[in-house]
């Protein structure tokens, strides 16, 4: 049986609490002989700053580079608002993404039947929703140069951000999206703004070329990103996999997040290239939610997004889709029984703590393996 090297970076706020439930799950899988893990733990964010005056140490970064997958909790909080900008807690996550060369961000939006009433949309619109947004993570307007603010000398200033994409950046993110679509419902929607942006013209052109060369079996649709946002709210189940750039991906994935009813439910994966020597893809997995310092240490945090992020690691880093499917089923079963953390509480539901939710999911997984 293969041994998977896993680096756990709990971070700040509720990060350690939700990561504790991953440790519980990993321990159970190990004890049952279902999967074998070699786990290490490190500091990141404010916790790292408090200990070492940096948001992530070189030693922890070396562990991340050596791991098969990195599991990340959350960083930040008011405690560190006044620390120097270059060592702010969030800089630790940015360095991880940069040094691991993670360019593909995967954000699933799944609405479990038991939570359809929690969405702001009608239950029939979101029940059974299962879409994947693939966001390009290292290019575009967030990283393009020049990026300046110029004083024009007449009481006016001019701010400039630059949207830049090269062909190879679009090709590689398109391949990730097409490969995912092939394993799902064989449908990909590419979103850009080719009607007003030259990068949108190139994006449309390159995605079309990749489709024609390599993925003719996948149904490809092009859509303007603003229209896509509208359609996500109007009838989200029309989509399967959506691929888009950094800026639009940031916006569209947040729109999709709220279709599900709670940020506490949503995992994410950030993937790099596959090493041709080891055939391993560098990857970082994290919940979409933040550090929520206002509820930290109270047992109120929802661990499902963190556990589902580990599920994505099982699927994309460890090639254990069988286990990932069972974990998803266990989460759905627990929710169907009416167990809810505080963020999901509703009439008739049983409100449970962070650890009680994690324990219930592991017990359900145990029943599925019986």
UniProtKB/Swiss-Prot annotation:
Enzyme Commission number, as recorded: 1.1.1.85
Pathway(s) the chain acts in: Amino-acid biosynthesis; L-leucine biosynthesis; L-leucine from 3-methyl-2-oxobutanoate: step 3/4
UniProt: substrate binding residues: 97, 107, 135, 226
Keywords, ordered alphabetically: Amino-acid biosynthesis, Branched-chain amino acid biosynthesis, Cytoplasm, Leucine biosynthesis, Magnesium, Manganese, Metal-binding, NAD, Oxidoreductase
Cofactor(s) the protein requires to work: Mg(2+); Mn(2+)
Sequence positions that bind NAD(+): 77-90, 290-302
Cofactor binding note of this UniProt entry: Binds 1 Mg(2+) or Mn(2+) ion per subunit.
PROSITE patterns named among the record's database cross-references: IDH_IMDH
GO biological process: L-leucine biosynthetic process
GO CC entries: cytosol
Known catalytic reactions: (2R,3S)-3-isopropylmalate + NAD(+) = 4-methyl-2-oxopentanoate + CO2 + NADH
Predominant location category: cytoplasm
Site (Important for catalysis) location in chain: 142, 193
Residue ranges of the TM segments: none
Binding site for Mg(2+): 226, 250, 254
Single annotated GO MF: 3-isopropylmalate dehydrogenase activity
Superkingdom field: Bacteria
Pfam families named in the record: Iso_dh
HAMAP family assigned to the protein according to its UniProt record, in alphabetical order: LeuB_type1
Assembly and binders: Homodimer.
Function, in words: Catalyzes the oxidation of 3-carboxy-2-hydroxy-4-methylpentanoate (3-isopropylmalate) to 3-carboxy-4-methyl-2-oxopentanoate. The product decarboxylates to 4-methyl-2 oxopentanoate.
Similarity section: Belongs to the isocitrate and isopropylmalate dehydrogenases family. LeuB type 1 subfamily.
The protein's name: 3-isopropylmalate dehydrogenase
Native source species: Nitrobacter winogradskyi (strain ATCC 25391 / DSM 10237 / CIP 104748 / NCIMB 11846 / Nb-255)
